UniProtKB/Swiss-Prot annotation:
It comes from Musca domestica (House fly). Belongs to the cytochrome P450 family. Its cofactor is heme. PROSITE patterns: CYTOCHROME_P450. PANTHER family: CYTOCHROME P450, CYTOCHROME P450 6A16, ISOFORM B-RELATED. Involved in the metabolism of insect hormones and in the breakdown of synthetic insecticides. GO terms for cellular component: endoplasmic reticulum membrane. Its main location: endoplasmic reticulum. The keyword Endoplasmic reticulum applies. The gene is CYP6A1. It catalyses: an organic molecule + reduced [NADPH--hemoprotein reductase] + O2 = an alcohol + oxidized [NADPH--hemoprotein reductase] + H2O + H(+). This is Cytochrome P450 6A1. InterPro entries: Cyt_P450, Cyt_P450_CS, Cyt_P450_E_grp-I, Cyt_P450_sf, Insect_CytP450_Detox. One of its GO terms (molecular function) is heme binding.
């Protein structure tokens, strides 16, 4: 046998072995007697992920197909087996009752080579517990009240800019405007920096924030490899954040930290808290103080959480209200009733937190558009888990499980006519009739959204201010139906959000 023939033979053997391994791996759930859909040779059950479909849509489709017939179907993320939790009682166990066995999210991060991914949302085990305990004090109601004045000041600038833009055109891109509002809020609260992106069309914080969420570093195939083989990917030094995003935020945070430490500046904001953790070696139990990279990661995720989730939530709310003037008028009436008690819209924090219909509108928005949780929650088993009362279902240690938030939120048994935008679903009477795990706008259990209070404050104020001063209707450039960006980590619009805007109050001088 000559060398060429031997090489072809060897390649054939390797290809056969690879195909055998792939087929054996795809028999993972069948060998356990757990139903699943037939997987694609390369992409498993997530064919079209990030190119055509958002992960939330794929998991929601599983919910619709298997609900009522199976409590825990299997799914393949590329070649990685995972499961989708459909049963409500099992959902409670995963998120709350048996949380100790599902404390990790199972998401890829690489602290060594991609340090900004080592943040509270991603990290696991004792490190997560310690960070959660130490970071929680910055999100108390008292801290929110301290940060509130900053949000209020930026809110006034938001109104000024919108009035100015209306002198040029009545059709405004509210997605862009609200993203700039939130960038300026978070820039001040997290970095102590006046971004002024509302007036600066080329603000770098805004551009890098968008890129970190909407522009993946790798294509879908490479991301499927990372998801399937996370430990190998870490050993290979694989990163997920774009390089320019990494460099921008690391340098921005370092400059701010150096300036504060050199000049002994304190603002009692989020950055001050993580600086205290960095400089106090006893502050995090078994782990010691925060390193600079760990500090930077927490500031980075705080920026992303406040920037994208709040702006998209407000944008989606305006999109729905623009199509339903009756709901918009009712919200405006309740907002005005409270705001009229304060001079020049300087509403207090406590008053803002007590506008019930505003809360209902935002909760219904997060039902239809679960921005913060990315339309699906993930958890990972820390040990083998036998499903109570159903021993057929055993999740081996390390199994990733999905909570299909989008599927739950659009379940007609829970929310009749789920495509309809109806804030009455969140009246006190209706909320009492549902279980907490039937609405997961901020997650549930010990690993819910730590920044929930801040996100609510930011979204409530921004939405209340613009509804008080402007009327919103759809225009020829409004994207109906709304299209979602399949590449985005969060549940965000694919296109701009143009609405017709009409001023209905005099400009505050």
């Amino acid at each position: 046998m000559d060398f060429g023939s031997f090489l072809l033979y060897a390649l054939g053997v390797l290809a056969s072995l690879a195909l055998y391994f792939v087929r054996w791996n795809f028999g993972y759930w069948k060998r356990r007697g757990i139903p699943h859909e037939e997987p694609h040779l390369v992409m498993g059950n997530v064919k079209g992920l990030r190119s055509k479909y958002h992960i939330g849509e794929i998991i929601a489709d599983y919910y619709r197909k298997f609900k009522g017939s199976d409590p825990l179907p299997g799914i393949f993320l590329g070649h990685k087996p995972a499961a989708v939790v459909l049963d409500k009682e099992l959902r409670k166990r995963v998120l709350i009752k048996d949380f100790s066995n599902f404390a990790n999210r199972g998401l890829y991060y690489n602290e060594k080579d991609d340090p900004l991914t080592g943040h509270l949302v991603m990290v696991e085990g004792e490190k997560w517990r310690s960070l959660r305990t130490k970071l929680s004090p910055t999100f108390t109601a008292g801290k929110m009240k301290y940060m509130y004045n900053t949000v209020l000041e930026v809110g006034q600038r938001l109104l000024e800019v919108m009035y100015e833009k209306l002198e040029v055109s009545s059709e405004l891109d509210m997605r862009d405007i609200l993203a700039r509002f939130n960038t300026d809020v978070i820039g001040s609260v997290a970095f102590g920096i006046e971004c002024n992106s509302l007036r600066n069309p080329h603000d770098r914080f805004l551009a890098m924030g968008r890129k970190s969420i909407e522009v993946p570093r790798h294509n879908a195939l490479i991301m499927a490899f990372i998801d399937s083989f996370p430990e190998l990917s870490r050993k290979l030094g694989m990163r997920v954040l774009p390089e320019d995003v990494h460099q921008f935020f690391m340098s921005s945070i370092k400059e701010t930290v150096d300036y504060r430490e050199k000049n002994n500046i304190r603002r009692n904001d989020f950055l001050d808290l993580v600086l205290d953790l960095k400089n106090n070696p006893e502050s995090i139990s078994k782990l010691g103080g925060l390193t600079f990279n760990e500090l930077a990661a927490q500031v980075f995720v705080f920026f992303l959480g406040g920037f994208e989730t709040s702006s998209s939530t407000m944008g989606f709310a305006l999109y729905e209200l623009a199509q339903n003037q009756q709901l918009q008028d009712r919200l405006r009436e309740e907002v005005n009733e409270v705001f009229d008690q304060f001079k020049e819209d300087n509403i207090s924090y406590d008053a803002l937190m007590n506008i019930p219909y505003l809360d209902q509108v935002l909760n219904e928005t997060l039902r239809k558009y679960p921005v913060g949780v990315g339309s699906a929650l993930t958890r990972q088993t820390l040990n083998d888990y036998v499903v109570p009362h159903n021993p057929k279902y055993v999740l081996p240690k390390g199994t990733l499980v999905f909570i299909p938030v989008l599927g739950i939120h659009y379940d007609p048994e829970l929310y009749p006519n789920p495509e309809e935008f109806d804030p009455e679903r969140f009246s006190p009477e209706m909320v009492k009739q549902r279980d907490s795990v039937d609405w997961l706008g901020f997650g549930d259990g010990p690993r819910n959204c730590i920044g929930m209070r801040f996100g609510k404050m930011q979204s409530r104020l921004g939405l209340a201010l613009v509804i008080r001063h402007f009327r919103f209707t759809v225009c020829s450039r409004t994207d109906i139906p709304m299209q979602i960006n399949p590449e985005s980590l969060a549940w965000t619009p694919k296109n701009n959000l143009y609405l017709n805007v009409q001023a209905i109050r005099k400009k505050i001088k």
